[in-house]
Amino acid sequence: MIQVIKIGGGVLENEAQRDAFLRQFAAIEGPKVLVHGGGRLATTMAERLGVETQMIDGRRVTDKVTLDIVTMVYGGLVNKQVVAQLQTMGVNAIGMTGADGGWMKAVKRPIKNGIDYGYVGDVIEVNGAHLRALLDNGLTPVIAPITFSADGLLLNTNADTVASQTAIAMAEAMRREGDEARGNVQLTFCFEKVGVLSNPDDESSLIARITPESYTQLKADGIVSGGMIPKIDNAFAAIEHGVQSVRITHANNLQGGTIIEER
């Protein structure tokens, strides 16, 4: 079993929450991969540098200056803080982006409906064998959501997408090696809520399970909206491509939350 866990930047910017989560992660037995965000920290750094952050429908517009900032924050500050902390907890962590080892390639998102997100990447190729080799050698990859293009551009990429594509690549790599147990990979999205909520202000309104049919209705009713949509889209993409199980949960409860189901 390989566990791929994505942790949101909102947790990482809180020292106590980050420490508690990383201790849980460190306690997980067996091979594991951590994918992290850091959007809020990037916004804070941009403010310090006098750079305005532009968002469209909750998504960051990444111009050249912003790309430099997110690369420094995600691939540098946040990534190395997490790696260093995991090392003190007995985890032989190694920090990386999609450019390291050339394991996650993307294309610059084209302008669509007049919207240009700038240096934002859509993943087109993942080499799961590279990550598997690290895991087989006792290393724990800690992945920042920066990918690269065929012409050498660094690209800001949605961390949920990076996590989903990582899990899919791991599942495919295991199947190629003869493991038919449906990839034997688990994917967990962790953030500040207990899971997907029918009322975002009521923690007791947890939706325990989401199927494609119920997801369609939840979107139509406006219960699921904004940034939760790409998160759930990525969850379903993982399930559809052979990842064994996917859940969305609070960072302090890796076994709780909302389970994403095929049917």
Each PLM stretch: what is its role?
Residues 1-263:
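C-terminal catalytic "cap/lid" subdomain
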